[in-house]
């Protein structure tokens, strides 16, 4: 039995998230189906990040076990023949049989895009959050600085989170302007349920003048969800990539 790692990109618009759900299309379901059609094996992929409905990815990670003799790097092209256009395998290789995509030391990078125009653009409706009016980028940057570092992010996650600990480390948090788009780029060792979207909603409210930048410090200390900003909608969020710090995902030669 061999373990194959996949780098998966997808447009999450049409899917009810990553994880298999009854009577709803998901990324995991499509990958399982493609592998079954290619190899004849009834296998199930394990994903590194179980993204929500409407969330996208450039570089999510998944693994599956197979008895197929197809070379690891050939699964990229072989599986793409069985996948819809909205899901593409970017790379594939064989890894150690004990590699688990969620049980390793990782750094994940997410991007959230906000379209700041008077009227929305239909071409961007599935990939941005449309926010009208003036937004102070510099105030957003000030607030973002308080979020970097190791903190208890209980105020910045869904109250239904099942995580054993709400402490996470944020390595960087950038607020960038690209024309009419504001980009929030965040890198951390892990993220709680809805954490990036709540951080985004909070920063936007800072930019709109509803919160002062320094109030973010009080949000972190309070550990109460209702003190932070709104949860930004899912479609602006993209998982950019996942770095395995200890090289656990090394290629098997």
How would you label these PLM feature ranges?
Residues 1-253:
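Structured-RNA-binding interfaces characteristic of tRNA pseudouridine synthases
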């Amino acid at each position: 039995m061999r373990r194959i790692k996949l780098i998966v990109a997808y447009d999450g618009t049409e899917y009810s998230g990553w994880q298999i759900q009854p009577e709803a299309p998901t990324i995991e379901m499509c990958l399982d189906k493609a592998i079954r059609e290619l190899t004849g094996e009834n296998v199930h992929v394990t994903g590194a990040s179980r993204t929500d409905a409407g969330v996208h990815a450039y570089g999510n990670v998944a693994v599956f076990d197979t008895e197929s003799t197809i070379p690891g790097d050939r699964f990229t092209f072989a599986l793409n023949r069985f996948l819809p256009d909205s899901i593409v395998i970017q790379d594939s290789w064989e890894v150690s049989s004990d590699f688990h995509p969620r049980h390793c030391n990782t750094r994940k990078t997410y991007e959230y895009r906000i379209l700041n125009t008077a009227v929305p653009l239909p071409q961007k409706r599935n990939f941005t959050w449309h926010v009208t009016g003036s937004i102070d980028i510099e105030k957003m940057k000030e607030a973002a600085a308080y979020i970097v570092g190791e903190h208890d992010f209980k105020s910045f996650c869904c109250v239904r989170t099942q995580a054993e600990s709400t402490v996470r480390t944020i390595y960087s948090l950038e607020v960038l302007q690209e024309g009419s788009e504001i980009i929030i780029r965040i890198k951390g060792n892990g993220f709680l349920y809805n954490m990036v979207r709540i951080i985004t909603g909070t920063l936007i409210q800072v930019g709109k003048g509803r919160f002062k930048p320094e109030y973010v410090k009080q949000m972190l200390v309070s550990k109460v969800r209702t003190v932070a900003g709104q949860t930004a909608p899912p479609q602006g969020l993209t998982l950019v990539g996942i770095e395995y710090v200890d090289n656990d995902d090394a290629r098997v030669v």
